Every structure is written in C-alpha cells, then in structure tokens.
Amino acid sequence: MKLHSATCIATLAAIATITSNAQAQTAPAPAPASAEVKPVEPYTITGNFGIYSQYIFRGLTQTDRKPAFQGGFDLATPGGFYAGTWGSNISWLHDAGVVDHGASLEWDFYGGYKYAFNDDWGMDVGVLQYWYPGDYLEGVTKPNTTELYIAGNWKWVSLKYSHAVSNTFGIPDSHNSWYLDLSANYPLTETWTLNTHVGRQEYKGQTNGFNNGDNLNYTDWKVGVTYAAAGGWNFGAYYTDSTAKDAGYTLAGRNIGKATGTAFVQKTF
C-alpha cells in the first residue's frame, strides 16, 4: 500500500507539473504598452522671402542690377505631389520698351510630382507658368511663358530640362525653345554650401525671316556660396556670367548677360 501511495503521489505531481507548464505556454502574453501613433499630415506648407542685390535668371539680370524682393509659398503632400507660387520685381520689360505701364512683376505658378528612388537618387516632373501682368504695346508678343520640365538628381547634383510649350519670354514663334540646367550644391560643412551651375538656352523659330537662335542662344554659368544660419536664415553671394550676345540682350544700353556679382539674405519658414 505504501508503494502504491508513493506511486500515485508521484503520478499526480507529474500531471500537475505538465498541466501547469501547458497553462503557462498557452496563456496569452501580456499586451504591450500601446505606442503613440502620430497622424500623417495631409500636406505641408513652407514659405520663403529674400532680399537680393539683383535678380539673376538663367544668367541674365532681370532688374538692371538693381535690388529685388522675392518670396513664395509651397504646398507638398506625403505622396510627392506639390504646387507653389513665387514672385519678384523686375525691370527688363520696361527696359525693353514693350509696355505702356505695369509689367514690373514676375509671378510664377507651378506644380508637379517628386519621387525618391532611395536616399541618393530622385526625379521631378512638372509645369511652370511665368506670368508678367501689364499693358503691352500693340503687336508685342507677350512674355508670359509655359514650360514643362523633368529633372533628375543624385545626392547634391541635379540635371533639369525645361521645354517651352508657348512663345518664350516675348520672342515670336519661339515654341519648343528649351533650357538645360546642370547644378551642384556641394556641402562644405554643416552650414556652408558651394553652389555651382552651368546652363544652355536654345531658341527655336524665326522672327522676320531670321532664326531666333542666331542672336538669342547662349550659355551661362554661376559659382557661389551659401551660409545656413539658425532660425531658417540663409546668407549668400554668387558670381554669374554668360555668352549672351549684345545683338540679342542689350537693354537700356547694357548687355544683361555680362559678368556680375549678387548678394542676398533669405528667410525660410
């Protein structure tokens, strides 16, 4: 009897152990502490405003080397789509003598799509409308211009092709003119960036039987530096030059594509 009792006790102990282990293995794990889930913003809005010693566009001064006040806003979605607007004072249309009054403003509107393949490679496609409000002389081709563009970037280097689907900056019969922009913004330090650029403007079509490109095609280049300060402030300066011909780019007695320097201060927010 004692032998049987010991055996039974051992058997019951084994069963209890197995049951306890089984319950431990099948019991649900304690729920992890819930992590705070931040909602994804449907879009972001950023802005910028700057004061420049002059406005240079594709190697050409747009303000006859006088100061320019510039600013804009951009809206971007998490999916890569974006839209924005930007403006600056100008003087080149008055200098060209093609307006009665007005035309002292360039107002741009644009939208497109950006995609990042990885941390190094990306692309950008979109449309850009240049608008120059004003009262123009009769028979003048208005400078309002629409361009489609596509760009690719690798780290700090970008290559952008812009194709005009309208007349280009007031030149008659200039549809399909284009501009190619190769730029590199190399970070020297966490706050200093070296800015370089070379571009090529090609005009298509004819005016009064002469090819537009004969006097209007040119190459431009730029080199400069930018300092990123605290609070979204940027300070910089750059040197620009071009091969713009006197016959095509002399306004108010001066070639607007000659070598010049520009300084600026900009605030982003």
How does the language model describe each region?
Residues 43, 65-69, 103-107, 142-148, ...:
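Residues that define the transmembrane beta-barrel architecture of outer-membrane proteins
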Residues 79-85, 119-125, 156-161, 190-196, ...:
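Repeated loop/turn-to-beta-strand initiation elements of outer-membrane beta-barrel proteins
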Residues 22-47, 56-69, 224, 248:
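Outer-membrane beta-barrel biogenesis signature
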